[in-house]
């Protein structure tokens, strides 16, 4: 039995949408991956996508960034139709940040040198570049790890590093792909707090995809559940756990909220 004791409670009814899918469908050959998806991610929201592995969550991220394009439908970012925009133009113009499930850093560079290397690509001003690197190391409480090679960091420390790397470009939208996967309970809690604090302080829009309901729902404002290429439910976490479609598709009857 999974028990969640507290949900975030925030309203986004009057906020502008940052990412919007309109009638998006995608097929690979004869296999239908996404079937007429319609949803919005609002400004300043922590939005979650929940579903089993292979349901299309990472595919949605690839569509948002422009790595792939849909067969049908429109993708809008801040109200502008970006369907067909190449990935480099889309990520730069709309300031999209992406944190992959695996990797995203240089194994044989120290934590500090990872940040320094990427900062030299995305930040022109040398003084600000150094300040930004030091700020992120301090913000994520990585000071005592900055001289350790990335390959020797723990799972949670690597996640913090990759998130810090993604923030060097000062994104307005941050996509986190399976960020809780293969982490222990205490590390997951730490990462949840990091994500919530990041949004609260920077007002960034964050979208997380994951396959574990208890991990995702504890830190998002709204979530949608995917099954067989469709959205079967979308609501606040507290409403989702009581949604019959969500229970039938994903939670089961033993998922409770106290």
Segment roles from a protein language model:
Residues 19-21, 34:
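Conserved structural motif at the start of ABC-family nucleotide-binding domains
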Residues 149-153:
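Conserved ABC ATPase signature
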Residues 102, 109-120:
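Q-loop/switch helix immediately C-terminal to the Walker
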Residues 50-52:
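The feature captures the beta-strand-to-loop junction immediately N-terminal to the Walker
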Residues 127-145, 196:
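Conserved ABC ATPase "signature" region
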Residues 65:
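Helix-to-loop junction immediately C-terminal to a conserved catalytic motif
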Residues 82-97, 102, 240-244:
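ABC ATPase NBD coupling module
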């Amino acid at each position: 039995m999974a028990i969640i004791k507290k949900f975030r409670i925030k309203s986004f009814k009057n906020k502008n949408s940052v990412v919007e899918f309109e009638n998006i469908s995608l097929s690979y050959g004869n296999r239908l991956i996404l079937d007429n998806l319609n949803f919005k991610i609002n400004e300043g929201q922590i939005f979650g996508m929940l579903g089993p592995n292979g349901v299309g969550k990472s595919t949605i991220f690839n569509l948002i960034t422009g790595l792939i394009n849909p067969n049908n439908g429109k993708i809008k970012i801040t109200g502008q139709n970006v369907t067909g925009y190449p990935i480099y133009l889309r990520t730069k113009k709309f300031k999209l940040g992406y944190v992959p499930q695996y990797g995203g850093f240089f194994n044989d560079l120290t934590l500090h040198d990872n940040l320094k290397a990427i900062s030299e690509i995305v930040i022109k001003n040398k003084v600000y570049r150094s300040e930004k690197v030091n700020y992120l190391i301090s913000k994520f409480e990585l000071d005592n790890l900055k001289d350790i090679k990335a390959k020797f960091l723990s799972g949670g420390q690597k996640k913090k590093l990759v998130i810090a790397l993604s923030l060097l470009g000062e994104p307005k939208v941050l996509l986190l792909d399976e960020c809780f996967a293969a982490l222990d309970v205490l590390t997951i809690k730490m990462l949840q707090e990091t994500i919530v604090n990041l949004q609260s302080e920077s007002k960034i829009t964050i979208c997380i995809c994951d396959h574990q309901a208890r991990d995702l729902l504890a830190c998002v404002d709204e979530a949608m559940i995917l099954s067989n290429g469709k959205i079967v439910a979308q609501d606040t976490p507290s409403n989702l756990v009581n949604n019959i479609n969500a229970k039938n598709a994903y939670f089961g009857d033993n998922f409770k909220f106290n």
